[in-house]
Amino acid sequence: MPASRPAILYIGEVRDTETAAEVVKAASNGMLVITTVHAGDPAGAILRVVSLAEQSMGDTAAVSVAQALRLVVHQSLSFAKSSDGWGRGHYEAIVLASDGASHPVANHIRKGTFPNMREVWTQQNIRIKNCRAEPADGVLHALLGNK
């Protein structure tokens, strides 16, 4: 009987070096990894995972994340204060997709230019709102089913 290996790894939250390193290694080995990280934006989430993983993996952490990362979904919920207390909440999601080692997101990860990713996700989210991804968007193109 052949050995079985799980195809998907769910990790509730990455908060320490050991977990970050294991998440990066699993993703680098082709496993679909779904996890959460607390951060202010998609770049901050990636930076947090890379920074934590680097403590045990060294410089290979950024390269591994750059090659393995495919999708980041950043969610935020804010509440406005009203005269009766707290008003209605506002939900916002930002999507950042990467299509592997040659994608601009991967280049930013390897170079450590995390703040420069904002332009990439801004353009991607405009295309998502218009339901139009380009073939060069790779993952987004597949998700939106554009022909």
Predicted regions and their residues:
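Short, flexible helix-loop junctions that flank or precede catalytic/ligand sites
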Residues: 1-147
